[in-house]
């Protein structure tokens, strides 16, 4: 097992913690305002903008919209997590990236039935990090399908 597959990226949306396998991450960017083009949005596909990344435009998805999470973070202060997909890279708009953590720091947690019903399929797992529930972010529920190549 690679070192990257044993690590998780922790990020926040509206104060809620999420974790993401590091193997899915290409890069984290925090200076994004000048690189965004909201005119290239496709709300039907969940794309809120396009991001100029390494001389190409990639779609930007805001999971807070699908999850109905309110955020007080202004767009210019948000962070982008660039993810690998089968059709190319795509970007995830988040409020902040907290840190990296090793997989052994997380404990499995049973997801309550009512929460399973309420999530509308956007997530299916929760893990605990020092007693704080973290939603396991499953990129395939938000945009396209994800490539696990390193």
Q: PLM features: what roles do these ranges have?
A:
Residues 1-150:
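An acidic, low-aromatic, low-complexity terminal/linker signal
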């Amino acid at each position: 097992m690679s070192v990257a597959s044993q690590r998780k990226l922790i990020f926040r949306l509206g104060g809620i913690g999420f974790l993401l396998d590091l193997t899915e991450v290409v890069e984290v960017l925090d200076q994004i305002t000048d690189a965004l083009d909201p005119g290239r949005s496709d709300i039907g596909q969940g794309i809120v903008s396009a991001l100029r990344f390494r001389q190409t435009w990639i779609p930007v998805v805001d999971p807070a919209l699908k999850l109905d999470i309110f955020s007080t973070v202004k767009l210019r202060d948000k962070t982008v997590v660039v993810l690998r997909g089968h059709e190319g890279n795509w970007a995830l708009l988040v409020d902040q990236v907290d840190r990296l953590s090793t997989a052994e720091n997380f404990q499995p947690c049973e997801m309550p039935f009512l929460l399973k019903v309420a999530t509308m399929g956007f997530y299916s797992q929760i893990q605990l990090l020092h007693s704080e529930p973290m939603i396991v972010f499953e990129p395939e529920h938000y945009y396209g399908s994800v490539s696990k190549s390193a």
